[in-house]
Amino acid sequence: MQTGMAFWASKTLLSAVEMELFTELAKHPAVLATLQGRMGLHPRGARDFLDALVAMRFLERGEDGVYRNTAETDLFLDKAKPSYIGGILEMANHRLYGFWGSLTAAVRTGESQNESKGGHDPFAAIYADPARLREFLRAMSGVSRGANMEIAQKFPWAGYASFADIGTAQGDL
């Protein structure tokens, strides 16, 4: 059952990233009523939404009712921090999530369910839309940031006057 309903947890996280909830809480931890106003959350589902994020350990709720990011969430899902890796989650939410909804059709027909459906070039579709391209580039840069930081710290740069950053989308290295 847990696996069959796992999309509930996934979509809860993806919606929180989309709304920039973690970025807002990094600036100002708050109680439910304050978050409803600041984030535009409807009273009907706000508490359940936030408490689901607490149960999944993305948020903490103190005895005073104040919601705040966990240390990991604060580090990786606050859009204002250079350590933000949520770009891949933004792309998963906007671009990939819907494709997975067509998995049964893909398995039965063998047809791609993404932009390559019908023989089209998926990258041509991404490059044709500036907003989708920015999202894709942010996703690729964010997901490679940890490795880039390690390379930057460990590579013996002293013997080189220039280099080309070819695989990290936005020149993150």
Predicted regions located by residue number:
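Conserved Class I S-adenosyl-L-methionine-dependent methyltransferase catalytic core
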Residues: M1-S162
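Conserved beta-strand/loop positions that form the S-adenosyl-L-methionine
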Residues: I166
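Conserved SAM/SAH-binding loop
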Residues: A169-Q170
